[in-house]
C-alpha cells in the first residue's frame, strides 16, 4: 500500500541532484513506488549523521511495520492517535524511499486518523522545530540502530508521543473554533484566528476572493479608502502570507479564509 501511495504522490521517474561533502555534484534517478536502492541519512542540527535503515533491511522492516499495524488495528488496544504516532515514528526510522518519505508519512498518519473518524492533521511550519526536537529526544531513548527504531514501543518514544497528542489537540481546537465562528470579521490563517484592526481589511480580502483580478482602484472604491492605503494593506498582507500575486497573470491568490 505504501509503495502504491508513493507511486501516486511522486513523478514516475525523475532525477535528484545532491552536493557531496567534497563539493562534487552527483545525481540519481528516483523510481516511484520502489524502495530505496542506496543508503539514506540526514545531518542533524547537532552536526551528527543520522542513518536510516539500509536498502537490504528495508523490505523486511516494512513488511514487519505493515503486519504490526494490521495486528494493532485488529487488537484495538491502542487509540487512533497512539497508532498514528507509533506508525509515523517507526516509518520515519526506516525511511523506505529515496525521496518523498515525509509526504508518505503525513498521508499515512491522516489515513489512520481518518479510519477512526478523526480530522486530518497538519504539522504547521511553526511547529517544525518542536517536531524535530521531539523526534530527536525519542531517538536518544530508543537507540540509533535502524532496527531498534523500527521496533520502538510507545513508552520509548514518549517525548514524540506527548508532542503528537498536543498537536492533535491543538488542531481539533482550531477546527472547532473555525466551525463555530459566526463573525464575518474574523479570518483564519495557518491554523490561527485573525481579527483585523481595520474593518477595511476584511472588505479587501472578500473583494479579492470574489474577483482575483480586481484593480487597486476598484478595491479602494469597495473599501472606501484611498488607493495608497489599499497598496499598503496589500503589501502587509503579502508579507504575512495572507495573499500572493501570481507572476503569470497578476491575479491575487488568498491563503487566509473566513468561517462564514
Report the location of each language-model feature.
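FIC/Doc superfamily catalytic core
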Residues: 1-99, 103-260
Amino acid at each position: 500500500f505504501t509503495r502504491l501511495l508513493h507511486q501516486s504522490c511522486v513523478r514516475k521517474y525523475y532525477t535528484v541532484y545532491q552536493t557531496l561533502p567534497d563539493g562534487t555534484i552527483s545525481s540519481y534517478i528516483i523510481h516511484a513506488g520502489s524502495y530505496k536502492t542506496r543508503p539514506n541519512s540526514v545531518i542533524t542540527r547537532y552536526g551528527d549523521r543520522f542513518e536510516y535503515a539500509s536498502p537490504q533491511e528495508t523490505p523486511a522492516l516494512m513488511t514487519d511495520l505493515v503486519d504490526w499495524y494490521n495486528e494493532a488495528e485488529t487488537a484495538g488496544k491502542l487509540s487512533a492517535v497512539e497508532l498514528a504516532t507509533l506508525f509515523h515514528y517507526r516509518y520515519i526510522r526506516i525511511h523506505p524511499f529515496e525521496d518523498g518519505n515525509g509526504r508518505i508519512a503525513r498521508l499515512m498518519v491522516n489515513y489512520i486518523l481518518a479510519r477512526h473518524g478523526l480530522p486530518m492533521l497538519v504539522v504547521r511550519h511553526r511547529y517544525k522545530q518542536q517536531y524535530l526536537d521531539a523526534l530527536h529526544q525519542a531517538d536518544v531513548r530508543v537507540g540509533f540502530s535502524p532496527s531498534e527504531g523500527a521496533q520502538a514501543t510507545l513508552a520509548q518514544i514518549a517525548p514524540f508521543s506527548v508532542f503528537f497528542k498536543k498537536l492533535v489537540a491543538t488542531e481539533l481546537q482550531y477546527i472547532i473554533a473555525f466551525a463555530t465562528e459566526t463573525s464575518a470579521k474574523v479570518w483564519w490563517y495557518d491554523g490561527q484566528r485573525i481579527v483585523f484592526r481595520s474593518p477595511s481589511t476584511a472588505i479587501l480580502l472578500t473583494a479579492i476572493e470574489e474577483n482575483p483580478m480586481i484593480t487597486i482602484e476598484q478595491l479602494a472604491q469597495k473599501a472606501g479608502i484611498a488607493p495608497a492605503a489599499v497598496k499598503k494593506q496589500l503589501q502587509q498582507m503579502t508579507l504575512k502570507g495572507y495573499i500572493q500575486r501570481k507572476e503569470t497573470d497578476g491575479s491575487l491568490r488568498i491563503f487566509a479564509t473566513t468561517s462564514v
